[in-house]
């Protein structure tokens, strides 16, 4: 990843880190990029929805509280919601075979638009959905590898 570039991690990167624990290199890699990292409120909501155990809830709270405390929480504004609707409508129109997938793309679309708005790169393990979105909206994307 380029030095000095803002990063916005997709939910799956945090989930992998939380599942693997603090001794694994994945969380260490996340910590190393914290000075360049924003957290999308959409990702925070997905993390909270998926945190079942008290330990998981505590870890998610730590991440979200850090982002809020240092001013690194990014939330889609009204215009982003409208653009997301336009993007998803265009996908339905141009690629009708993906019609059933469109409802599952809302959050990823909002994440991509938030990243674009702040000049960040989306980092994800879910390249397929984000590559689809890149056919309809410009944003920077990198695999988490």
Which residues does each PLM region occupy?
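Acidic, PIN/NYN-like endoribonuclease modules and their adjacent C-terminal/linker elements
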Residues: 1-4, 112-145
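Short, well-structured N-terminal submotif of metal-dependent ribonuclease cores
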Residues: 1-43, 49-65
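Short active-site oxyanion
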Residues: 4-5, 34-37, 69-72, 116-121
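Alpha-helix capping/helix-boundary segments
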Residues: 13-14, 43, 80, 111, ...
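Phosphate- and divalent-cation-binding pockets in alpha/beta enzyme and binding domains
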Residues: 17, 46, 83, 132
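Helix-adjacent hinge/juxtasegments
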Residues: 63-75
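Active-site neighborhoods of divalent-metal-dependent phosphate/nucleic-acid chemistry enzymes
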Residues: 72-121
């Amino acid at each position: 990843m380029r030095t000095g570039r803002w990063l916005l991690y997709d939910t799956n990167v945090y989930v992998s880190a939380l599942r693997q624990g603090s001794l694994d290199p994945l969380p260490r890699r996340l910590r190393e990029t914290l000075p360049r990292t924003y957290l999308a409120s959409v990702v925070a909501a997905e993390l909270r929805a998926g945190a079942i155990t008290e330990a998981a809830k505590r870890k998610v709270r730590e991440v979200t509280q850090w982002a809020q405390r240092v001013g690194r929480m990014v939330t889609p504004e009204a215009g982003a919601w409208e653009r997301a609707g336009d993007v998803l409508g265009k996908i339905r129109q141009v690629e009708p075979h993906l019609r059933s997938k469109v409802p599952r793309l809302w959050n990823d679309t909002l994440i991509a638009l938030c990243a674009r708005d702040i000049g960040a790169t989306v980092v994800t393990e879910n390249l397929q959905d984000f590559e689809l979105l890149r056919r309809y909206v410009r944003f920077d994307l990198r695999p988490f590898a």
